From Swiss-Prot:
Entry's family note: Belongs to the accessory Sec system protein Asp1 family.
Coiled-coil stretches: 359-386
Keyword Coiled coil on entry: yes
Organism expressing this protein natively: Streptococcus gordonii
A biological-process GO annotation: protein transport
Keyword terms of this UniProt record: Coiled coil, Protein transport, Translocation, Transport
Protein name as it appears in the record: Accessory Sec system protein Asp1
Subunit structure: Part of the accessory SecA2/SecY2 protein translocation apparatus required to export cell wall protein GspB.
Knockout mutant characteristics: Loss of export of cell wall protein GspB, the protein accumulates intracellularly in protoplasts.
Role summary: Part of the accessory SecA2/SecY2 system specifically required to export GspB, a serine-rich repeat cell wall protein encoded upstream in the same operon.
Classification lineage: Bacteria, Bacillati, Bacillota, Bacilli, Lactobacillales
Superkingdom of origin organism: Bacteria
């Protein structure tokens, strides 16, 4: 049996607490990672796997569903802590909750505002899938408490506030009784156990939450896992020894690195981790070489495995007459006027192209910034008429004068809020352009998974020049690179075939065969 221990953590200091955000504020980082890719591989081969979840994830079922791994069996540390036994999901409606008779409900496009006696009483916030995610309660316009809902239909935890600052968080069982209380003020942070449930814990007080998490995870592993099991541990950015020390003596461990998560890792701190693991996987060739150079004694156990996202379909853009270009802009970098102009100029010169400018998880002002820049460049250097796709009559107008015509243009700006929205956008895309100093990782993974050629300024493991993409020496070469893939089918088909061959090397059967071979070699070396 393979057990996967993911790193689905929060972005703050309390990494064990998964970020709880409303649907209109999407995460500023990828959800897709190495663990998700690996589990899908095992599912494709109908091999049994189990997830061991360390993080507090009250919306875990929706997360697993979004990533197409909902059927995966799992053990959750916080389900153990909170005595949650059922995995049946239940969608709560606003009417299912108890409210005072004088509550007034105001429905907005984003959330439900609740008022009592003319005063703000609560904000009801929703997740991406439309379920009640959390409710903020206010007193005298100050945040008083935050109820976080489990996607199985109960209040999972309550965060209490004083003067707008977090004081403590109670983690509840499905009956609403608090099981543990986490004190959140920096100078007094610790965890206490409700004495009523003392028999379920080794101690009544813990110095920090990770101590309790490791206690529960260690107990589960020691009582439920066979000694010769295989553990795939997603490498944490800082240390992995706490988890690795819990693994049975005769089990086999695989340590998996993912660039998006581990780019801040201090190489020097990884020595003990690499010595312990039987096999080490990385998603980037350059990081593999770095580890091998830094730890030559462990070099033979370090291997490169490229992730793909099997939710994408190959080659669907051939069904479109127009060539759709997806141009990724990274708002963490300064807008490159010249790059945007060159892309717009190419589209203006080629009437059979359409342009989608994709911005990842942008706030409204970020979208506006891109819109203003596009309008400015077209106004100063191009002709808006060159971008007209079609015009049609405005049904509200009384006469067919030109000024009453609605115009549709061959470019639009799209805010990419998550991986699924990018997948939908790439479904019929012909060419990806990303001229950032650090190309978006998931866009590159999605591009090769869908067989779409990509134009970049920077070389990477995912794009090979003139095979499945074009690496520019300078932005001035953009038109040459775009023509290479859009003028005729030969080069585009070659990129598709290259992607197919690369994906074939990473099908479930091939990957698992390699894993077993690498593991055997590593174990034999011991």
């Amino acid at each position: 049996m393979y057990y996967f221990i993911p790193s689905w953590s929060g972005s703050g200091k309390r990494v064990w607490h998964r970020d709880i955000i409303p649907w209109y504020r999407s995460m500023q980082r990828l959800e897709f990672d190495d663990t998700i890719h690996q589990i899908r591989i095992f599912h494709s081969e109908n091999l049994p796997v189990k997830l061991l979840l360390q993080a507090y994830m009250p919306h875990a079922r929706y997360f697993l569903h979004r990533q197409d791994i909902f059927e995966t069996e799992y053990y959750s540390v916080f389900d153990e802590i909170q005595a949650v036994e059922s995995n049946d999901m239940q969608v709560l409606q606003i009417k299912d909750l108890e409210w005072e008779d004088d509550c007034e409900f105001i429905y907005t496009p984003f959330l439900i505002i609740v008022r009592r006696q003319g005063q703000l009483y609560a904000h009801v916030e929703f997740g991406v899938e439309g379920f009640i995610s959390f409710i903020k309660f206010f007193k005298d316009d100050q945040l008083e408490k935050l109820n976080i809902f489990d996607d199985r239909g109960f209040v999972s935890s309550i965060v209490y506030y004083e003067d707008g600052q977090e004081v403590c968080q109670d983690y509840l069982n499905p009956n609403g009784d608090w099981r543990i209380r986490e004190y959140l003020k920096f100078e007094n942070s610790h965890v206490v156990v409700n004495p009523v449930f003392s028999r379920d814990f080794d101690k009544l007080e813990y110095e920090c939450m990770p101590d309790l998490i490791l206690e529960k995870l260690g107990y589960y592993i020691s009582h439920n896992v066979e000694e010769d099991s295989r553990f795939v541990v997603a490498a944490q950015p800082f240390t992995n020894q706490g988890v690795l020390d819990l693994l049975p003596q005769h089990s086999h461990s695989i340590l998996s690195f993912f660039h998006e998560r581990n780019q801040a890792s201090n190489i020097e701190n990884l020595k003990a981790d690499l010595e312990y693991a039987d096999l080490v996987l990385t998603d980037r060739m350059d990081f593999k070489e770095t580890l091998q150079n830094y730890f030559p004694l462990q070099a033979e156990k370090i291997h490169y495995l490229s992730p793909f996202d099997t939710r994408l379909q190959l080659g669907k853009s051939q069904q479109r007459h127009e060539s759709k270009i997806f141009y990724q802009i990274d708002l963490s970098e300064l807008l490159n006027d010249y790059a945007i102009f060159k892309v717009l100029f190419y589209v203006a010169q080629h009437p059979d192209t359409e342009l989608v400018i994709g911005v990842y998880n942008a706030w409204q002002e970020g979208i506006k910034q891109v819109e203003n820049k596009v309008e400015e460049l077209i106004s100063d250097y191009l002709d808006l008429k060159d971008f007209i796709k079609k015009s049609f009559k405005n049904n509200q107008a009384e006469n067919p004068l030109p000024e009453n015509q609605e115009l549709e243009y061959r470019f639009r700006i799209r805010n990419i809020t998550d991986e699924l929205s990018l997948i939908q956008e790439l479904d019929d895309t012909r060419l990806i352009i990303d001229l950032s100093q650090q190309p978006n990782l998931y866009t590159q993974i999605a591009g090769i998974s869908a067989g779409i050629p990509q134009i970049n300024l920077v070389a990477s493991d995912y794009v090979t020049h003139l095979q499945n993409g074009y690496i520019l020496d300078s932005i001035s070469q953009l038109a040459v690179a775009a023509d290479y893939y859009l003028q005729g089918l030969k080069n585009w088909n070659q990129a598709l075939i290259y992607s197919i061959e690369k994906i074939k090397l990473n099908t479930g059967h091939q990957v698992i065969k390699r894993w077993e071979k690498w593991l055997k070699e590593a174990i034999d070396e011991k």
